[in-house]
Amino acid sequence: MKKQKAKYEEALQCPVAYEVALNNVSMRNALVKSGVPFVNLPGNVFLPFMGIVLQDVYRKQLVKADKMMPATQMVFLELLYMSDEESVLKSEVANKLNLTKTSITRATAQLEEMGLIQQMKSGTEIAIKRNYSRKEYYENAKGYLINPVQKVITIMRYEATFESFSAGETALSQESELNPPRIEERAIYKGEEVVDQLEIVDARSEDPDDCLKIQLWKYNPSYFAREGRVDPVSLACTFKGNEDERIEMSIEELLEGTRDRLF
């Protein structure tokens, strides 16, 4: 392309640029690295001879507003549970939830695309704020929420020397009239180092009293856990797709209590 560009410029006696269809970020980066001017409307423009640099629209294209990413749900929950109705610095949320700059940027972009938050300048930083009261914020987000459970494993109870939180039917039974399950259920983050060291067993071959079911979560439940239990909104999400009438009634009871406390 550089040789062709030189021929065109010699023939036309002026700088030239290519109109391209960028299929991915790598293609765009390769053109920039090679110094080849290009235009890919509406947002990617690289005309160095005019002092114009491209505007990256890939972030918005890659952020879909159908279901929350794990990091997005973390930011959503942080804004839901915080007592302050005012805005909060995006950097503060990222630090509190241990999110990278890329993760917090994509998470807030997705929440903004869903119409749940707004972003605004605050000095030299960016602040974020809910677009609704806490109740409306939750109601408008329900369709986007994901099940945080990546996988469920069973281990022997004596292995549970790590921090974990009451989850699943165990936690639900503590918040409703549901009877507790035969095997206790608890949750940890799937990225914890201890996960690779756990020995998975077949509960059918063991005494249920000696076993624990461990939910491996896509985000760290410790950030929102209270009184040793996973947070109520995340707990309800772990039962997505469960059509057991007992569970459905207990979740409604759980959420009613949550609404009374939060809203």
Predicted regions and their residues:
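A short, conserved structural fragment
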Residues: E112-G123
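Short glycine/proline-centered loop/turn elements that form peptide/ligand docking sites
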Residues: M68-P70, E86-S87, R106, Q110, ...
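Long, low-complexity, charge-rich intrinsically disordered regions
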Residues: M1-L41, P48, A141-F263
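Minor-groove-contacting beta-hairpin "wing" of winged helix-turn-helix DNA-binding domains
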Residues: G123-Y132
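Short amphipathic alpha-helical interaction segments
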Residues: N98-E113
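Short acidic, hydrophobic short linear motifs in intrinsically disordered regions
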Residues: D84-L97, T108
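Short helix-capping/hinge SLiMs at alpha-helix to coil transitions
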Residues: L80-E85, R226
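Short alpha-helical segments that sit at the start of domains
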Residues: F49-L77
